[in-house]
Amino acid sequence: MLQVYLVRHGETQWNAERRIQGQSDSPLTAKGEQQAMQVATRAKELGITHIISSDLGRTRRTAEIIAQACGCDIIFDSRLRELNMGVLEKRHIDSLTEEEENWRRQLVNGTVDGRIPEGESMQELSDRVNAALESCRDLPQGSRPLLVSHGIALGCLVSTILGLPAWAERRLRLRNCSISRVDYQESLWLASGWVVETAGDISHLDAPALDELQR
């Protein structure tokens, strides 16, 4: 059975400031660096063999810290990037106009073809993150990969594995540097394919972490 671990990046400056990041970027805070070191210690105990990361700066830095602890190289995969939030990226969440807030709500509430101008839909996000996960099945037998990605992207991935719509990600609380695990299994009695073992574990962190509504 293939076990794949999913880690959200450490806290960033814009997480703390409640700015919309999307595929724009801000550096990890000192707290985010500490979170990454704590999740790295946990990852080392798990016997991780491969680290596959979004190529955005905040995930790169988180992955570098984990890789140093695990002694692994990093593979960067743009399919693990966060949802493209278009013209709303870099904006403070409380500064949105009524029209802009409607764009955001249509996107996260699952309105058909909902998207922010110049951004992408939840279905487009789902297609690419699920394709990235599926690529893990091509790794050598006995591999135990860890994917470093983003809150909405990972929430979307876990939701769709559970058979929920992509926009159901908002019902999951995946805090900074939380660990989730999904397994690929072939079983006559249990669900074949990808199953969710755990989601949003933060037992390795020594202080509260921000959730997606606080980014």
UniProtKB/Swiss-Prot annotation:
It holds the Pfam family His_Phos_1. The record marks H150 as: Transition state stabilizer. Substrate binds at residues 8-15, 21-22, 58, 60, 82-85, 104-105, 151-152. The keyword Isomerase applies. SUPFAM superfamilies: Phosphoglycerate mutase-like. It comes from the Bacteria. The active site is at H9, E82. Pathway: Carbohydrate degradation; glycolysis; pyruvate from D-glyceraldehyde 3-phosphate: step 3/5. One of its GO terms (cellular component) is cytoplasm. It catalyses: (2R)-2-phosphoglycerate = (2R)-3-phosphoglycerate. PANTHER family: BROAD-SPECIFICITY PHOSPHATASE YOR283W-RELATED, HISTIDINE PHOSPHATASE FAMILY PROTEIN-RELATED. NCBIfam families: PRK03482.1 (NF002901). This is Probable phosphoglycerate mutase GpmB. The lineage of its organism: Bacteria, Pseudomonadati, Pseudomonadota, Gammaproteobacteria, Enterobacterales.
